[in-house]
């Protein structure tokens, strides 16, 4: 009887161990969003983001918790994820652009306006020939290097 009981317990424990998988941190968690904080001090007009404006976001994991991360040409924690302004904050443009928090420090680098960028270290920006929409020619960037593991990350452009 004891043999059967021990065999049963062993099989049950083995099944439990085989059923475990590594947690990636994305299951059931909300993606990171970005909000503007504080508003920049400027004399320029038309300086607010409008609903639908898009930014590109790169995220880099820190090797050393006390030193901000450096972007690499590719293979960062997140490479050029597109985030859209919803009137209050920047949210991912679809699930494939979502960035999820992790247990290790992440630094965020953002730019406006969104463009296709393969290598953040060789970013080329061209001023629009048609100046009808001046904001499309306003290159701005922001970064957050506090290594926060929060869902709402402040950015100052």
Segment roles from a protein language model:
Residues 16-19:
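C-terminal motif of bacterial Sec signal peptides marking the signal peptidase cleavage site
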Residues 26-157:
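Short, low-hydrophobicity acidic/polar segments
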Residues 12-14:
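Short, low-complexity S/T/E/D/G/P-rich linear segments that nucleate or cap local secondary structure
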Residues 1-9:
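Bacterial N-terminal signal peptides that target proteins for export
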